[in-house]
Amino acid sequence: MKKQTILTGIRPTGHLHLGHYFGAGQNWVKLQDKFDTYIEIADVQALTDNFNNPDKVRKSVKDLVIDLLSIGLDPNKATIFIQSTIPEIAELTVFYSNLVTIARLERNPTVKTEIKQKKELFGESGESITYGFLGYPVSQAADITAFKGKLVPVGEDQLPLLEQCREIVHKFNNIYGETLVEPEAYLSELPRIKGLDGNEKMGKSLGNAIFLADEPEVIQKKIMGAVTDPEKIKIDDPANP
């Protein structure tokens, strides 16, 4: 029986951190034994908010592949590929962009949240938002449909991106006939690792992460400086970690 195709991806903007590993990476390692698994290194999408630092993206591609192999992804079981090496993805992105309005992209909750988080790049009210960043959900739709991905591992916060992909598939198939596979969400209980500063999310750009490539002394220094709950004095005190 042919395995179902599952596709996921990650932007190369630095090494993997613990949030990546516990939130997604360890799940990918399990999925490679059950599905025809594709892992995309989304270097083109990484440029949408790193357009002024292409060297960072270029270097991070190699670092990211090494990290993915180190956590247990097996090239004999999972296909790891670099987005920019497949020109057909860029072609599909252009075709799909004709099926999506600017207003629809602006309403995407995930995109709206990310714009707010990147005020230093796009301005306080998003007045400097680029077409490339606003339209990255269209690029993601091209990634998924190019490989006929039936299942896409996502967290709850990423569901709006997958829903936009499904809308594109519906519209394309209505116009040109049943051609594209409609993807479904592969939801799993993935933990969200808090940042060292107490932030709800650990992130590279937030400067609150422990990276898989960190040296032991660096990890120790980061942990010693991490924010803890001042109300938890004794071990049996209730905590808010």
Where are the language model's segments positioned?
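Non-catalytic terminal extensions that flank enzyme cores
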Residues: 1-13, 33-34, 66, 70, ...
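Active-site cores that bind ATP or allylic diphosphates and position pyrophosphate for catalysis
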Residues: 112-241
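N-terminal Rossmann-like or analogous alpha/beta NTP/dinucleotide-binding catalytic cores
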Residues: 2-141
